[in-house]
């Protein structure tokens, strides 16, 4: 089998008129901010997606029942016995905050040095347009699709898909019974293998707040008065061992352990190593788990307790000798199958009370269940075999990823085999500055999706 080099793929991309037409669409899409957390641009971008999919020949419904409009675009096969595949994507992005380093304007698609840069180019607007390009490339040489293709695009994925369950329930009759659902995105890993995964972790996020007094107090009382800062730090410390495991009674007993195939897939394919993580992030502290087998088990199959940020006391220039009266932290627990967000928060509340920290206030912010698959469904196995034709280094098949998304919500609603693969890379920098994809990977994804369509002929 002959595989194209990166240079050859870029040349093919540049000579492909359909791909070039849709790069103009991607450029316009990235220029339109759509940030759920700030309630910016959701209606405009959903409407723009409706317009481009109608122009591409799809039947489109724009459902505005909830905060972020839900876009459904259907390319219906004329074959009455045709199967259906669904692409799940989202059009919202995280902000491009001022503390992020961008070489160019994040909302202007930049093409340089074999890559494309811009907010959402990987997560997730680039995937929408690449997959739409694949449909159009097939229809350029065929009168009809051999399979019905449905795109579902939400606008709140970066905020725990707050209304997705309601949208799916509303449109269940249209979406139920599909042969396959292709998830929003994926990467080519550092070894050049396409990662094909079947799940993701869940999450529960919450704020922890402490108020120790009506006002800040002079620090001369530090020997006899407990400050909000110390109370919060001690409360947080009581919930985690030094090795990173969570100290909450009854939590691990609810975890569903992976089956033998899931364990075998991670052992065979997971390329993330302690050494790679240390190098990529320039770690200054020792890893909580450095032995590779346990390291991977932690990443894929165990929950984790994480502090996103802590706020308390004086942070200005110089010194202010006080005992802070208030302290707060933003906290998350990454979940695995068996753990339900609200139940986890209840266990944490109970543990804090038992540990003597009953003055801590917990405020739930969002939650999402986890989902995991052993990747044995026939339609998923077909994707794995098709992908091997396009990636010289082969594929990496994983039952889950360490990230979070609404896979559980979608599976519970639609009961369809789900698989994630995409056009990102190990350094795509999603949510960070200079978010990017490689042009060759972008075009290879287009070709693979087109080949998936061909496989239904």
Predicted regions located by residue number:
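N-terminal helical capping/dimerization or prosegment-like subdomains
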Residues: 2-99, 326
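An extended, acidic, His-containing surface patch that forms the Zn2+-binding/catalytic region
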Residues: 80, 191, 247-326, 334-347, ...
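Active-site metal-coordination/substrate-binding segment of hydrolases
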Residues: 82-153, 444
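Acidic, glycine-rich active-site loops and adjacent beta-strand->loop/helix elements
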Residues: 91-93, 152-161, 184-189, 212-215, ...
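A common structural junction motif
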Residues: 92, 239, 243, 349-358
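Acidic/histidine-rich catalytic neighborhood of metal-dependent amide-processing enzymes
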Residues: 124-199
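A short core secondary-structure module
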Residues: 166, 222-243
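Flexible glycine/proline-rich, aromatic-decorated loop/lid segments
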Residues: 195-211, 421
């Amino acid at each position: 089998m002959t595989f194209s080099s990166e240079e050859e793929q870029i040349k093919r991309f540049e000579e492909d008129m359909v791909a070039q037409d849709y790069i103009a669409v991607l450029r316009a899409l990235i220029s339109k901010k759509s940030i759920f957390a700030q309630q910016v641009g959701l209606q405009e971008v959903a409407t723009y997606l409706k317009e481009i999919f109608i122009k591409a020949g799809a039947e489109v419904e724009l459902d505005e029942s909830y905060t972020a409009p839900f876009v459904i675009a259907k390319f219906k096969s004329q074959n009455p016995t045709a199967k259906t595949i669904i692409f799940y994507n989202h059009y919202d992005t995280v902000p491009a905050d001022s503390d992020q380093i961008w070489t160019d304007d994040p909302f202007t698609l930049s093409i340089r040095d074999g890559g494309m840069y811009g907010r959402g180019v990987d997560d997730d607007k680039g995937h929408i347009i690449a997959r739409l390009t694949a449909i159009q490339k097939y229809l350029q040489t065929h009168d009809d699709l051999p399979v019905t293709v449905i795109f579902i695009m939400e606008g709140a994925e970066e905020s725990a898909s707050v209304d997705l369950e309601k949208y799916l329930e509303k449109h269940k009759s249209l979406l139920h019974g599909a042969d396959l659902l292709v998830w929003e995105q994926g990467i080519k890993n550092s070894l050049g293998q396409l990662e094909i995964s079947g799940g993701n972790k869940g999450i529960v996020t919450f704020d922890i707040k402490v108020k120790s007094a009506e006002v800040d107090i002079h620090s001369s009382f530090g020997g006899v008065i407990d400050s909000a800062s110390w109370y919060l730090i001690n409360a947080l410390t009581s919930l985690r061992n030094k090795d990173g495991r969570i100290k909450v009674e009854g939590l691990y007993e609810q975890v569903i352990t992976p089956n033998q195939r899931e364990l075998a897939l991670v052992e065979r394919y997971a390329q993330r190593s302690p050494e790679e993580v240390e190098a990529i992030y320039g770690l200054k502290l020792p890893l909580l788990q450095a032995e590779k087998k346990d390291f991977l088990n932690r990443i894929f199959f165990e929950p984790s307790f994480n502090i996103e940020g802590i706020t308390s006391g004086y942070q200005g220039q110089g010194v202010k000798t006080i005992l802070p009266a208030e302290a707060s932290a933003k906290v998350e627990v990454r979940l695995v199958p068996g753990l339900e967000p609200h139940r986890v928060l209840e266990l944490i509340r109970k543990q804090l009370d038992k540990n003597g920290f009953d003055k801590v206030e917990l405020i739930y912010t969002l939650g999402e269940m986890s989902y995991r698959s052993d990747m044995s469904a026939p339609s998923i196995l077909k994707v794995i075999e098709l992908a091997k034709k396009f990636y010289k280094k082969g594929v990496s098949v994983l039952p889950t990823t360490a990230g979070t998304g609404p896979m559980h919500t979608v599976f519970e609603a639609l009961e369809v085999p789900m698989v994630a693969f995409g056009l990102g890379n190990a350094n795509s920098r999603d949510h960070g500055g200079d978010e990017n994809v490689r042009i060759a990977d972008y075009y290879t994804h287009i070709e693979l999706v087109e080949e998936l369509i061909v496989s239904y002929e």
